[in-house]
Amino acid sequence: MIRKIIFLEMLLLGIATFLYSQDEISKITITHGPYLQNVGSNEATIVWITDKPSIGWVELASDGNGSFYAKEHPRYFDTSNGIKNTSTIHAVKVKGLTPGKQYRYRVFAQEVLKHTGYKIIYGSYASTDVYYR
């Protein structure tokens, strides 16, 4: 009886370890960036690269006293013709910025596991720290 219990515990531990390691292997990461490109007086393009095909977006807020994480911010998606791009290279052009004003931003990527027609299956997220510019 003791052997059966030990065997069952070892089996469950092995399965849990395998599943955890598979989850860690499959997580998406942002490998490069974010970089500011084509900075104008009232616009900027934010570019970053991921290790897996994904959709991407930027959360942007004006520089303030409160924590960036305290509330939700508008999302600016990497799109073409209104459709979210699935890529490893992401670029989001943010318009309507006020000259001389500082902004805080953070980039995100969500892995696209499968994209068939209008059916999209998403995977895990990756994000950066908050940047001040």
Regions found by a protein language model. Name each.
Residues 21-133:
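Acidic, histidine-bearing metal-coordination/catalytic regions of metal-dependent phosphoesterases
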